[in-house]
Amino acid sequence: MSVAKAKGAQKTVQKGIHNKVAKKVRTSTTFRRPKTLQLSRKPKYARKSVAHAPRLDEYKIIVNPINSESAMKKIEDDNTLVFHVHLKANKFTIKEAVRKLYSVEPVKINTLIRPNGTKKAFVKLSADADALDVANRIGFL
């Protein structure tokens, strides 16, 4: 009995154990190709000899301050500056431009596109910065 058992064990060791892998059941009719490794490109030379200058710098973003009556009311009551800004500028770029140009920390930016096609930005300043002082420093009061 033990000899027969040993012979059987020897046979399985020589054959190797190949478990049957269960077939994956496909539930969808479409085959989605699996995502493979995509290495980042390493070009031999630059395709442009000179990089393009920044299209929107802080001087292009803020076109001019608005000093209408309603804008003055915003400055006095809400600690908010009102600017006419570039149409392609977004809130993040406007915030960065105000920070660089006027060295104040904007808390919140609200924007709207006016009926004449220009963009207006309401820049709410932090409590420690006074909008009236900043407006005087800019020179639109």
From Swiss-Prot:
This is Large ribosomal subunit protein uL23A. The modification Phosphoserine is found at S68, S70. Component of the large ribosomal subunit (LSU). Mature yeast ribosomes consist of a small (40S) and a large (60S) subunit. The 40S small subunit contains 1 molecule of ribosomal RNA (18S rRNA) and at least 33 different proteins. The large 60S subunit contains 3 rRNA molecules (25S, 5.8S and 5S rRNA) and at least 46 different proteins. uL23 is associated with the polypeptide exit tunnel. Signal peptide: none annotated. There are 2 genes for uL23 in S.pombe. InterPro entries: Nucleotide-bd_a/b_plait_sf (IPR012677), Ribosomal_uL23-like (IPR013025), Ribosomal_uL23/eL15/eS24_sf (IPR012678), Ribosomal_uL23_CS (IPR001014), Ribosomal_uL23_N (IPR005633). Keywords: Cytoplasm, Phosphoprotein, Ribonucleoprotein, Ribosomal protein, RNA-binding, rRNA-binding. Its main location: cytoplasm. One of its GO terms (biological process) is cytosolic large ribosomal subunit assembly. SUPFAM superfamilies: Ribosomal proteins S24e, L23 and L15e.
